[in-house]
Amino acid sequence: MSVSYNRVIVAFCEGQHDVAFLSRILLVNGFLLQDLKIGQLPPPFDKRFEKELSQVRIPDKKLGFQPNGPKLPSVCFYNDGNLIFIHNLNGDGRGRERVELVTMYKELSGTDDFSIEIAYRFLYFFDADELGIDARITEIKNEIGLEEATQLSNGSIIDFDGSEWGGYIFHDVQTQLGTLEDQLLGYFYNKNQQLQQDILSFLQTNVLIQERTRRFISSNAGESYSGRSQYYEKKSVLGMYAQLQFSGVSNAVLISNTDFLKAVDINRC
C-alpha cells in the first residue's frame, strides 16, 4: 500500500451486518476498499497484524475455526489521508476485547525517533435494542473512561486522552429503540411498501412453534432441540429480501449489494 495516512479511524461493530452497512456508507462517500494482503498494509499495522496471526495456537483450535478474530480488522478503507479499519466484535458485550484493541493500536504510536506518531479516532457502533440511545451512549462513555459531565451525543466526536472518540447507535426513528435492521427495513419499505407487507404476512402466517426455532440435533442417540430460539422476525424479513435478489446469500451480502439501499438513503443517515 503506497498511500500515506495522517489519521487512523478504528470502528468497532457488533456484527457483520454493521460492517456491511458501514462499508456501503464509506463507498458512497468516496472511500476506497483496500483489498490487500496483511503484508501489504502500511507500517506499523502490517507487522502488528502479522504478529496477531502468528500468536494463534493452531493445535489448540478445532476444525472450522476462523483465524481472523476481533484483533484483525474485517475490512480496510482509505480516502484523503484517512485510513479506516473496521472490526467485527461479534456482539455488544465485548468490552474487554474493545479495550484490548484500543491498547493495541495506541501502543503502535509514539513520539521517539523509532516510532510513528499516529492520530487516532475510535468509533463505537451499537444497536439501541431495548436500552435506548442514551443508555448506549452512557455505556460508551464508561468504557472510554469519560467523566459523567462530559458531553457525548449520538454521532458526535470528542477529544480525550490524546485521541478522538465517538459513537453511533442504530435505532428505529419512531421509537428511538431497536437495531440496524429497523433502519434498513425503513429504507426498504420506502422502495416497495406492498412487498414488505407481503413478506411480513407470509412470515406471520407460517410462524412455527417456538421449539422448532431452536437448534435441532439428530444422531444415533436420538433427536432433540437445544439452546434458545433463533428466530428474529426482522432478520427473517431481511432474509426474504436477500432470497428474492441473490439466492442463497446471507443478510450481510444483501446489505452489501442490494438496490433497496441507495446513496440517497445513506446520505440521509
Regions found by a protein language model. Name each.
Residues L26-G30, Y105-D113, I140-Q151, F188, ...:
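Hydrophobic, Leu/Ile/Phe/Ala-enriched alpha-helical segments that form helix-helix packing faces
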Residues G30, K37-G39, S109-D113, N192, ...:
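Short, flexible coil/linker elements and helix-boundary hinge sites characteristic
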Residues M1-E107, E143:
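Domain-level signal for Mg2+-assisted phosphodiester chemistry and nucleotide/NA-binding surfaces
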Residues S2, K106-I118, I157-I158:
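Surface-exposed acidic, glycine-flexible loop patches that form ligand/cofactor-binding
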Residues E117-L254, D259:
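Activity-critical C-terminal alpha-helical subdomain
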Residues P70-P73, L83, N90-E97, L101-V102, ...:
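C-terminal tail/extension regions appended to the core domain(s) of diverse proteins
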